[in-house]
Amino acid sequence: MNTVYFSFYPTAQASELEAELGAGLERFWREAAAVLDKGAINLVQPTRASLSLSSNFFSALFLYSYFRAEIPKERRVFYVAINQCLRGLVTGCDNLLDDEYKTTLETDLPAQAHRFRSVLDIMVADRVLFTLLSAYCHQQGLPIDVALRASNACLDALARSGAPEASEEGGIKQRLRPEKVLTDVHHFKTGMLFQAPWVVPALFEQPMPTAAAEAQRSSYRIGIGCQILDDMVDLFVDISRRRHNYVASVIAHGESRKAWGDLQSAHGTGQSPGDFYAAHPGIATRLKREAMEMLQEGLGALFLEPHQHLVGPAAAFIAARIGGLTPG
């Protein structure tokens, strides 16, 4: 699958942009090591897998969008490192909210210490973020206030994205119609989150490249497509925890009473969402098609003409990473 990543970039610049991705990720790790240096917790050097293209798909997409917007190389690398900080913040918060652990920082903490590892990921990512921003401002002769503004802008973007999560704590009182889930919940939760990589460039790229607006629109659609797929995977969990879920809303408001009844019965019986979709293949096919069309529209708008043949493979890769769902 790495060939998909390599092919995102023009052939003459493939190795250069791959190197930029690696340089940005390695810069994040260097700064994280400096933050933890001589402390009680030690950073473990990242594995090749954690720095691989296949583990950093969205980072590669965002880097591609910066390249397409003709942002200079030095700042592209800088933004890759910034985005890794945002990734650490978002993943750490998601881990705590979902009671799981997806690694963003390798340390010598016990593997089972999921909650504290997530807390540490958040603290280190936030510290590295401000370190990167303040160092950049110093190098460019900009006042420290600019770094503070950029840091606050990141917080604002992530807080706007996370607000729907807060509204779900304690459980939702009603299941919104599917269109309302997209406009009132997923718009913020995922659509705007996928635009967050442009928050810092919006301050440092003046004037903003004309291609930036299209890149943000395409990222938004990619994000919504991802969220629909994610909702397919998390259908039973979200129903059990009384969370908003686009798929649940489609079934509750747009399908037969039998389908909704079957869903209500199935989610607490040890069945998987896959079992439910197997019993209702039409629902699964329509939802997967909608998600894939959203992904393909976003990727198609992002990719340059020579790379349009990669839209389908890239969308399929995303779908497989989210839940192993076979695109329909």
Residue ranges of predicted features:
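Helix-rich alpha-solenoid scaffolding regions
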Residues: 81, 88, 115-124
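Acidic, Mg2+-coordinating active-site segments of isoprenoid diphosphate-utilizing enzymes
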Residues: 64, 91-113, 125, 167, ...
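All-alpha helical catalytic cores of prenyl diphosphate-utilizing isoprenoid enzymes
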Residues: 20-37, 49-61, 119-229, 236-239
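Conserved N-terminal diphosphate/IPP-binding helix and adjacent helical/loop segment
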Residues: 1-108, 163-179, 315-328
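A structural signal for well-ordered alpha-helices, especially hydrophobic packing surfaces
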Residues: 90-93, 133, 197, 226-229, ...
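Primarily interfacial, aromatic-capped hydrophobic alpha-helices that serve as membrane anchors
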Residues: 123-146, 254-305
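Short hairpin/turn module used for nucleic-acid contact or packing/dimerization
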Residues: 288-328
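A ubiquitous short alpha-helical element
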Residues: 43-50, 111-118, 181-186, 278-286
